[in-house]
Design a protein with these regions (language model features):
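Extracellular protease catalytic domains of secreted zymogens
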Residues: 1-185
């Protein structure tokens, strides 16, 4: 939860429009915050390329006195296994704003991370998530999300936030990860 809340500060202050620029019905603020929580608490030193579905990750488990692998506060745990988390963009119309919509956005970001880890355009997993010069899919994913935040339009929706990630890929990596990004979204 602490990293999640810190993530709100990052997303609100990284957006070019400032702190009042993330308020529409498709805003992904909760998603970026969940994503940062997942990325910064994942043990990348022991993670394997197939771990996107093992184990599924809940958010807020500690606050609910659940074990680390508990369901947490979202409609499903974050996981690339569609049998565990089958939420997609088509579900956002029925999701609560902002937490439900953000959950769906984070689901896509988590899927993108594991697509990049398993894509031949990266070197799999970098055990050091803070190595922004690294070519591991986890590092590439975090860099793309952060650059997308910094360059997206004011009041981005789900699609425009994704498009900002695509532009970040073009800027940072000459678009070499476009297919992996689109598979996730």
């Amino acid at each position: 939860i602490i990293i999640h809340e810190y993530g709100h500060g990052i997303s609100n202050r990284s957006n070019p429009g400032g702190t009042g620029c993330l308020g529409n019905s498709e805003q992904a603020g909760e998603g970026w915050s969940d994503y940062l929580g997942l990325m910064l608490t994942q043990n990348w030193a022991t993670a394997l390329p197939g771990d996107g579905f093992n184990p599924p990750r809940g958010i807020g488990t500690y606050a609910l006195n659940q074990p680390n692998n508990g369901p947490g506060i979202r409609p499903a745990r974050y996981c690339t296994d569609f049998a565990v988390n089958n939420y997609t963009y088509s579900n956002i119309g029925a999701m609560a704003v902002p937490h439900g919509v953000g959950f769906v956005f984070c689901t896509a970001l988590w899927e993108m991370t594991w697509e990049l880890i398993n894509d031949p355009s990266t070197t799999g997993i970098d055990p050091n998530i803070y190595n922004f010069a690294g070519t591991g899919g986890n590092v590439v994913a975090l860099r793309l999300v952060m650059e997308g935040l910094r360059t997206q339009q004011c009041n981005p929706g789900f699609i425009s936030a994704r498009n900002a990630i695509m532009r970040a890929d073009t800027t940072l990596y000459s678009g070499s990860h476009a297919c992996a990004i689109l598979r996730a979204f």
